[in-house]
Regions:
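Active-site proximal loop and beta-alpha junction motif in alpha/beta enzyme cores
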Residues: 1-73, 79-292
Length: 292
């Protein structure tokens, strides 16, 4: 069996930056174990498998795998596969069946291999647990306890499909100094995935409002994490006034793969009513695997 795939860089318009993604076309013939093994072979943070949708009203169904496990939802695969489908079908919107639900993405074509996608997150963020003591967090991240927290923002645990420990730090300098090669990580951050999204406000920087880094034992550091940005809508919304607010988060700078994630928040009074994630993606290559 031969399978074809595209390679995209997501949350960027520049090749060899952003977060790389493999998109396997026509994956209906693959079993779950085969998809997991293909994702492990390609060894990117995520690989997307396009399948026939259950409903004819939808563009495609997708399965999302890391090299280690399947995910019900992830932001950079959603943006990347939406751009790939939008360019292929020459359409301005796609409806994608993911395990978390059906996601509608609005597509803007930039050129023959580049596009922009935005989607409303299928579930608004929820508190998913209690954060560790900031002294333990600081020790795990190689920081001082007084560097944990940013203004009114404190550590939280949120999910918009995937659980993250959301850890604000004092400034961009503290964010850049984080080191995770320390023992006891899973004990400090015990919830599934053991994933930490560290972030800070960046009023001194032009072009973005926040900077972030994501760490998880299975992945190491990730260049751009849409599902974490979706979870971050929870605490960020508490800083927003009534109406629509747009933020830009930079990620991946410390890895040499700069990324730009767009976040949109709407509040009606004190109630969070809408969250969206957006960004660019471009096709940088294609290939095939012989599975027999």
């Amino acid at each position: 069996m031969k399978i074809d795939y595209l390679l995209l860089d997501v949350f960027t318009r520049t090749a060899l930056s952003g977060n790389p993604l493999a998109v396997v076309r026509e994956a209906d013939g693959l079993l779950d174990d085969q998809m997991q093994r293909v994702a492990n072979e390609l060894n990117l943070s995520e690989t997307v498998f396009i399948r026939r949708p259950k409903s004819e009203r939808h563009t495609a169904a997708v399965r999302i795998f890391t090299p280690m496990r399947e995910l019900p939802f992830a932001g950079h695969p959603t943006v990347g596969v939406a751009v790939a489908l939008g360019l292929e079908h020459k359409t301005s919107a796609v409806r994608i069946e993911e395990q978390i639900g059906v996601i509608t993405c609005v597509i803007e074509r930039i050129d023959r291999r580049t596009g922009h996608a935005r989607f409303a997150i299928p579930h608004l963020p929820l508190v998913a647990g209690k954060p560790p003591d900031k002294t333990k967090i600081a020790l795990a991240l190689g920081l001082e306890p007084d560097e944990i927290g940013c203004g009114m923002l404190k550590p939280t645990v949120h999910t918009a499909g995937v659980v993250y420990y959301l850890v604000p730090v004092r400034n961009a300098q503290a964010l850049a100094r984080i080191e995770t090669q320390r023992g006891g990580w899973n004990e400090v951050f015990p919830l599934p995935m053991h994933a930490v999204y560290a972030y800070t406000a960046t009023p001194e920087e032009s072009g973005n409002d926040y900077a972030a880094r994501m760490f998880a034992p299975d992945l190491g550091e990730d260049a751009a994490t849409g599902s974490a940005a979706a979870a971050l809508i929870g605490p960020l919304s508490e800083q927003c006034e009534d109406g629509m607010t747009d933020y830009v988060i930079r990620q991946g700078m410390e890895m040499g793969r700069p990324s730009r994630i767009e976040v949109q928040i709407r509040k009606d009074g004190e109630q969070l009513t809408h969250g969206a994630i957006g960004g660019d993606a471009l096709i940088v290559g294609q290939g095939s695997l012989e599975l027999d």
